[in-house]
Design a protein with these regions (language model features):
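Terminal amphipathic alpha-helical/low-complexity segments used for targeting or macromolecular assembly
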Residues: 1-97, 220, 226-227, 231-275
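Structural signal for interior beta-strand "rungs" in well-ordered beta-sheet cores
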Residues: 97-237, 250
Length: 275
């Protein structure tokens, strides 16, 4: 469907001199507009049941190419002033999105109907699906993929991944609850219905240790579906002695048999997770 656009973007990626040609610049802008409308994504689910996703590298390339073709300009809202290449997103009433002052989403970020932006920030290339709340001072980085009915609590940091273009963005799947001041970065993948307790840090290399069985099972950059996760530590020997290393602990599971909200409350009550 977008084969011609993809061809132009790939050629411009290999030869940046082509960006001086207006048809190429128009193609780049068209891709970013489609991302802004949610018709194209920098990453998308291939098999949601298995939490399998694919990265649309050519779309990420278009987002990156958008920066050099945009001129710096002054923007104002009353007495407030900015000087940047990127416009902010507009038309929230028509989009059916609730946006509380002083929330900001950049043009090129898709915000689905019934999403709520408290005073927060959403960067270009991101996808925020329907019913999701981005709470106060939470940030959604470039190209991050946030599913349906997700709650990003106050101060949550969702990292952005533009380059390398083949790298997967941060993915937070449907019905996840990310506790306050938690950080998910470096292309980490939090699968559906997972709960992250307050101050949990998940990076691409974080040891995520399932301690619910007779033996620990360690994941990296991946939180399995319905996991209840809290900050933790493990001991590691160094030349200077033994020290604690930060990790994340899977201490339980949300039950499929219960309603999503009830399941969340049960998880917090049963495992003492602070959010």
């Amino acid at each position: 469907m977008y084969s011609e656009l993809k061809k132009i973007i790939e050629q411009a990626w290999e030869n940046r001199e082509l960006l001086s040609e207006e048809p190429v610049r128009q193609a780049v802008r068209q891709v970013v507009e489609l991302v802004d409308k949610g018709q194209l994504r920098t990453a998308e689910p291939v098999d949601p049941a298995k939490s399998e996703w694919k990265v649309n590298e050519w779309v990420k390339k278009a987002v990156i190419l958008y920066f050099p073709i945009q001129p710096m300009r002054k923007m104002q809202a009353g007495e407030l002033e900015w000087y940047d290449k990127m416009e902010v997103k507009h038309g929230y009433e028509e989009l059916g999105v609730r946006v509380v002052p002083h929330a900001v989403a950049r043009y090129g970020a898709y915000i689905a109907p019934c999403a709520i932006l408290m005073p927060s920030y959403v960067n270009i290339g991101a996808y925020v699906d329907t019913g999701t709340m981005v709470d106060t001072w939470a940030t959604v980085g470039s190209c991050a993929q946030i599913g349906r009915h997700v709650h990003l609590s106050g101060g949550v940091g969702i990292g952005g991944v533009l380059e390398p273009v083949q790298a997967a963005p941060v993915i937070i799947e449907d019905n996840c609850f990310i506790g306050s001041r938690s950080i998910v970065v470096e292309g980490a993948h939090v699968c559906r219905e997972a709960v992250l307790g307050s101050n949990t840090v998940i990076t691409g290399s974080t040891h995520i240790i399932d301690v619910t069985g007779p033996e620990p099972v360690t994941y990296k950059g991946y939180v399995p579906p319905r996991s209840v996760v809290v900050p933790g530590s493990y001991r590691k020997q160094f030349p200077a002695g033994e020290y604690s290393i930060t990790c994340a602990l899977i201490i339980g599971q949300r039950k499929e048999s219960t309603d999503k909200k009830t399941s969340l409350n049960d998880a917090l009550r049963d495992f003492g997770v602070s959010v």
